[in-house]
């Protein structure tokens, strides 16, 4: 094990995860999720987040189809998708996705199709940004472990 390389990777990991919180991508729920991961379940967070991203993709696609026809929008179906997306984003600590869902729900409540389309575009953008950033984070974790190090705990508060 090269302790200098491990220390650099760990520092990079800590800085990166702090930046994700500072930029509003993540909230404390992500920290709580990370606490559930241990040596027996080393990929727990990555697996949960992967399921979240799969759900996001499906929900965004379903809502997009529901909003396609301007004369026949099923706002109840869109609202149901927004509700599911908000719940799952809250459970993994995807703060920006969750925040867009709040605005999205307001647009559904007043049956504002244009507002819903804007929110759909924004939630798709935020989910894709977060996916890229968390993939980078998980790759950094793998590099640390492959170098013989341990994943550092990061105190965000």
Curated annotation (Swiss-Prot):
UniProt PTM: Two-component system major event consists of a His-to-Asp phosphorelay between a sensor histidine kinase (HK) and a response regulator (RR). In plants, the His-to-Asp phosphorelay involves an additional intermediate named Histidine-containing phosphotransfer protein (HPt). This multistep phosphorelay consists of a His-Asp-His-Asp sequential transfer of a phosphate group between first a His and an Asp of the HK protein, followed by the transfer to a conserved His of the HPt protein and finally the transfer to an Asp in the receiver domain of the RR protein.
Claim: Nucleus is one of the keywords in the record: yes
GO biological process: antipodal cell differentiation; cytokinin-activated signaling pathway; embryo sac egg cell differentiation; phosphorelay signal transduction system
Keyword Zinc-finger attributed: no
Pfam families: Hpt (PF01627)
One cellular component (GO) term of this entry: nucleus
Keywords assigned: Acetylation, Cytokinin signaling pathway, Cytoplasm, Nucleus, Phosphoprotein, Two-component regulatory system
One Gene Ontology term of the molecular function aspect: histidine phosphotransfer kinase activity
Tissue expression per record: Expressed in the whole plant.
Gene3D superfamilies with a match to the protein in the record: HPT domain
Modification Phosphohistidine occurs at: 83
Location (main, coarse): cytoplasm
Domain HPt, first and last residues per copy: 41-148
InterPro entries xrefs: AHP1-5/YPD1, HPT_dom_sf, Sig_transdc_His_kin_Hpt_dom
Compartment(s) where it occurs, according to its Swiss-Prot or TrEMBL record: Cytoplasm, Cytosol; Nucleus
Highest taxon of the lineage: Eukaryota
Residues annotated with N-acetylmethionine modification: 1
SUBUNIT field: Interacts with the B-type response regulators ARR1 and ARR2. Binds to AHK2, AHK3, AHK4 and AHK5.
Role noted for this protein: Functions as a two-component phosphorelay mediator between cytokinin sensor histidine kinases and response regulators (B-type ARRs). Plays an important role in propagating cytokinin signal transduction through the multistep His-to-Asp phosphorelay.
Comment text on domains: Histidine-containing phosphotransfer domain (HPt) contains an active histidine that mediates the phosphotransfer.
PANTHER family reported for this sequence: HISTIDINE-CONTAINING PHOSPHOTRANSFER PROTEIN 5 (PTHR28242:SF13), PHOSPHORELAY INTERMEDIATE PROTEIN YPD1 (PTHR28242)
Descriptive protein name: Histidine-containing phosphotransfer protein 5
């Amino acid at each position: 094990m090269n302790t200098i390389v491990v220390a650099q990777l760990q520092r990079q990991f800590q800085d990166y995860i702090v930046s994700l919180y500072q930029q509003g991508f993540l909230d404390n729920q992500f920290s709580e999720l990370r606490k559930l991961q241990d040596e027996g379940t080393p990929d727990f967070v990555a697996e949960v987040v992967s399921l979240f991203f799969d759900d996001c993709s499906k929900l965004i696609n379903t809502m997009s189809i529901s909003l396609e026809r301007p004369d026949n929008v099923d706002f109840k179906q869109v609202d149901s998708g927004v509700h599911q997306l908000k719940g799952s984003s809250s459970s993994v600590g995807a703060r920006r996705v969750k925040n867009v869902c709040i605005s999205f729900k307001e647009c559904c409540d007043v049956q504002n199709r244009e507002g819903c389309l804007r929110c759909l575009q924004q939630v798709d953008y935020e989910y894709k940004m977060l996916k890229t950033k968390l993939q980078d984070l998980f790759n950094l974790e793998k590099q640390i472990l492959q170098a013989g190090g341990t994943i550092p705990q990061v105190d965000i508060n």
